[in-house]
Amino acid sequence: MSGRLCLDLAGTKLWRRSLRTELLNSPSDMGRWMRQAELLDDPGPMDTRGLERVRRLREAIYVLVRAWPPGDDPSGAGFRDALAEVNDAARLPLPRHQLDVSGRLTRTGGVDEVLGAVARDAVDLLSSAQFGKTKECANPDCTRLFVDVSRSGARRWCGMAECGNKHKAASYRKRKKQQTVMET
């Protein structure tokens, strides 16, 4: 949906300005996200300490993406703490990828390897030209981030099924209501 692994992780907390919805409520939610993100085939047992580490990295990524580029005066200790969190995690090992004789890929590792992969993706994004195409959803309540790779660079929504269709439907209802008022 977002176009980047690090932004997918940042998107596991929704509606940050209003109804704050946590998608990583438990270690099993975290394991499911790791599988869906194709980081690990079998994350194995997860614990609350690992969950907290993943959430901490997620929040650091969100802070950095919203405040980047920092310019001459990084905005306070929160920014510096977030940068340190991402840089520390980027030094961790990556998931191990292996092919078997049939060509099947297996991805193994644990929380450290997932943190390493996500943090490196964040470092890559923040230091690349692609960062200039990073946007926040145009829905005022939605705080999902994405990379706009559309040809025109005019993508506005995190996803049509999520926010785009809701906005279009609301606009349609508003136009119909105004049209009805004008006709009476």
Locations of regions flagged by a protein language model:
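Short, cysteine/histidine-rich loop/knuckle motifs that typically chelate Zn2+
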Residues: 136-141, 160-162
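Short acidic, gly/pro-rich beta-turn/loop elements at beta-sheet edges
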Residues: 20, 147, 168
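Cysteine-rich micro-motifs
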Residues: 153-164
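Residue-level signal for short amphipathic helical patches enriched in basic/charged
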Residues: 129-132, 149, 164
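Basic DNA-binding region of bZIP-type proteins
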Residues: 162-179
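Short helix-coil boundary/hinge micro-motifs
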Residues: 1-136, 143, 181-184
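Histidine-centered nuclease catalytic patch
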Residues: 143-148, 152
